[in-house]
Amino acid sequence: MRITSTAFEPEGDIPSRYTCDGEDISPPLAIEDLPPETVSLVLVMDDPDAPMGTWDHWLAYDIEPRTQIPEAVEGLGTPGTNSWERTGYGGPCPP
């Protein structure tokens, strides 16, 4: 399985639109090579190099298998609580 985004290049910077300096919306994601027997997906977007330790930006589970997750998606599976102690996406916001 491979996850990519058309919003930025691999190993590139995340555009400000998807950070606290911009609209702070989730980027579009494409999922490739999803095994046919997949029942559900889990999404974890974290920053292991954050100054205060690993920072969870986006957590969701029980996501219906799909090949595209649209930009600014709402209601994606069952949301988990991120490091801001809220559900949904919270983009990078370096100090």
Model-derived regions: residue spans:
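N-terminus-centered regions that define maturation/targeting leaders and the start
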Residues: 1-95
